[in-house]
């Protein structure tokens, strides 16, 4: 069992029950999945970009991402239907907790001029989105072997009903919020 998973069961659940007054353990919000998405609009010109991005995302997530394709053609962006335009990986279970642990304890402190993550990036339904500008904050990525700095979107999906519950859940996982 992952370190954060044990921490969730032993410390987070009792803390949230006390804070929000849940009657059942099953009411306590939990993280269901973490989705990593890398948009690669520049991949239209060069197919090697997709391979490099898939390699980076595989190292970061620990599992192979799926290549996302364009749903419809957009002439202004020189994209045809079916063109590969990104890579996405969904983490659940133990891999999800291990990624979250590495992200909070190792990757976020490596961000340049890091002052904490925004507390306003919730979607109104208890899910949290964070954008990472460079993939080199992850220790799995070797700085000398990358061809370009690429950002990625990290979407944390929870069972929380409100943003306050989700923020309390992530804060109990030692998420470094600004305010």
Swiss-Prot record:
SUPFAM superfamilies: RL5-like. GO terms for biological process: translation. It holds the Pfam family Ribosomal_L5_C. The keyword Ribosomal protein applies. GO terms for molecular function: rRNA binding; structural constituent of ribosome; tRNA binding. Gene3D superfamilies: 3.30.1440.10. Keywords: Ribonucleoprotein, Ribosomal protein, RNA-binding, rRNA-binding, tRNA-binding. One of its GO terms (cellular component) is ribosome. The keyword tRNA-binding applies. This is one of the proteins that bind and probably mediate the attachment of the 5S RNA into the large ribosomal subunit, where it forms part of the central protuberance. In the 70S ribosome it contacts protein S13 of the 30S subunit (bridge B1b), connecting the 2 subunits; this bridge is implicated in subunit movement. Contacts the P site tRNA; the 5S rRNA and some of its associated proteins might help stabilize positioning of ribosome-bound tRNAs. Belongs to the universal ribosomal protein uL5 family. Part of the 50S ribosomal subunit; part of the 5S rRNA/L5/L18/L25 subcomplex. Contacts the 5S rRNA and the P site tRNA. Forms a bridge to the 30S subunit in the 70S ribosome. This is Large ribosomal subunit protein uL5.
């Amino acid at each position: 069992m992952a370190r954060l998973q044990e921490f969730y069961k032993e410390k987070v659940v009792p803390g949230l029950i006390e804070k929000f007054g849940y009657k059942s353990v099953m009411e306590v919000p939990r993280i269901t999945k973490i989705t990593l998405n890398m948009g690669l609009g520049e991949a239209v010109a060069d197919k090697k970009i997709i391979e490099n991005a898939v390699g980076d995302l595989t190292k970061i997530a620990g599992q192979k991402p799926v290549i996302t394709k364009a749903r419809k053609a957009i002439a202004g962006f020189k994209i045809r239907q079916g063109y590969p335009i990104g890579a996405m990986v969904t983490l659940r279970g133990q891999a999800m907790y291990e990624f979250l642990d590495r992200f909070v304890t190792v990757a976020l402190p490596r961000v340049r001029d890091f002052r904490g993550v925004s507390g306003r990036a919730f979607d109104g339904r208890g899910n949290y989105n964070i954008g990472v500008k460079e993939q080199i904050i992850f220790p799995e990525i070797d700085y000398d072997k990358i061809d370009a700095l690429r950002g990625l979107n990290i979407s944390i999906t929870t069972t929380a009903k409100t943003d306050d519950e989700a923020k309390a859940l992530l804060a109990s996982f030692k998420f470094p919020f600004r305010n």
